[in-house]
Amino acid sequence: MPLDPRKLSSFILILLAIGSYASLQIGHVKIDFFAAIISPLYGEATPDAIILWDLRMPRTLMCLIVGFGLGMAGAGLQGFLRNPLAEPSVVGISSAAALGAVLSIGLGFSAFGLYYTPAFSLGFAAVASWALIKLTSRAVNKHSVILIGVGISSLSGAFTTLMLSLSENPFAINEIVFWMLGSVTDVSYHHVLMSAPLVTLGSFFLLRAANGLDLLTLGEETAASIGANIPKLRRDILIGTALTVGSITSVVGIVGFVGLVTPHIVRPFVKHEPGKTLIWTPPIAALLVLISDITIRLLPTASEIKLGVLTALLGTPFFLYLVSKQRD
């Protein structure tokens, strides 16, 4: 059922505001929220203000960035590949980005500067994206895309496990496990400022592909005959996905299934148009990541469950449902 864009945008903004407030308010320590908000105005560094501004605020912002970027990348991949099962983690891009980060840590490059790990992650995400799009152009059918993605993911996972096995540095092992699980627990404003510009730039490339994705529903040959620039469309999706997924994974690790599930939630409300799905998926995905992170904080566990673990637990049944639906 399609909705009025203004009503939909207003509704989503309200939900995001409520979710952000809940994320700032909810935690293991109860704080006086409004006192913490105004404390910096008086130059006071109260415990509540430190918890709010130094811990929960960057965590909330990172949740929004993670959801926004992964949601847009997932919608872009599904629209371009015309495959509802496509998603950065499913097609191997997230695993490749994590491998880049793991290699940077395991080989000691991360010790030379703060930007080596993101650079490695972005580079590997770009290579995986290029390989996926290149091999997809020769695929016999759309299901071959998933098989190719499984191959990329398996290869990346194998090298990641190899690095974990060969590493003799316990600190490096802990970091590698962090990338494999995905978490926003220890993020800071530095991580937010490092990932936000790249996600924004990647989103620019993906949004440029919105009109082309609509034309692509007519078929590649028909779309090209009426003005769609298929090579440019492929390049925009490639660069956009690599930038968004690579920058996010370089900071928080692998957070899967966000980009898979959210486009399916949005699609019925936008008449199943790929371009509109690409536009409306990011804020909904950001909301889902916020809710997931809030759920993690509410669970009565000795230590917090990693965000990537929870999204995988919630997303895997949905993925299996989609696979069974495709077979039917």
Sequence positions of predicted segments:
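Alpha-helical transmembrane segments in inner-membrane proteins
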Residues: 1-328
